């Protein structure tokens, strides 16, 4: 499931980061948690991808309302955007990877990398359920990403450059910003 979620984040410009405890079905549903979305200066809101991600969440979790999600992109370099979010969240710096130089504690922000086509292939069945006919042969190349954990009422942030836009079947050489719980 984490691989599929990560792939969905890459392909749909989102990392369906759906963390949290599930409530028993006998309990009253809780109010959705309000998030303070911090938007990188000059970033553009990607409404089609945000809505597609919400639809994907509804397919994966049909009995739950979609979580608050926002997807943006910017021309700014990945490292510059990562520094902005790490500082705004009060974290020290971005670790080179999730192991944090083999430390026992997972860092609050770290780099990762991946392959666009393998990530798109991993979510192809979900794309078919959503009636999205993306040409996955165009998802070529490697990407760098940064994962930044949530803090208080602030969402988890996933940054990626470049990213594959499944709605247009093209690789976009911009930094994608996904904010989700």
Feature names for model-found ranges:
Residues 22-181:
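An acidic-aromatic pocket/loop used at catalytic or ligand-binding sites
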Residues 17-20:
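C-terminal motif of bacterial Sec signal peptides marking the signal peptidase cleavage site
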Residues 1-11:
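Bacterial N-terminal signal peptides that target proteins for export
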């Amino acid at each position: 499931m984490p691989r599929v979620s990560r792939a969905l984040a890459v392909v749909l410009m989102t990392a369906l980061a759906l963390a949290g405890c599930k409530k028993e079905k006998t309990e009253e549903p809780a109010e959705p948690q309000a998030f303070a979305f911090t938007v990188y200066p000059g970033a553009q809101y990607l409404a089609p991808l945000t809505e597609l991600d919400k639809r994907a969440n509804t397919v994966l979790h049909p009995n739950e309302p979609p979580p608050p999600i926002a997807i943006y992109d910017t021309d700014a370099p990945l490292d510059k955007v990562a520094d902005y979010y790490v500082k705004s969240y009060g974290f020290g710096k971005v670790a080179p990877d999730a192991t944090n130089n083999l430390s026992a504690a997972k860092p609050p922000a770290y780099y990762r990398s991946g392959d666009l086509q393998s990530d798109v292939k991993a979510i192809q069945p979900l794309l078919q359920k959503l009636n999205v006919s993306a040409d996955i042969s165009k998802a070529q190349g490697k990407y760098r990403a940064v994962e930044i954990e949530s803090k208080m009422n602030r969402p988890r942030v996933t940054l990626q450059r470049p990213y594959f836009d499944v709605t247009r079947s093209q690789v976009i050489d911009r930094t994608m910003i996904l904010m989700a719980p």
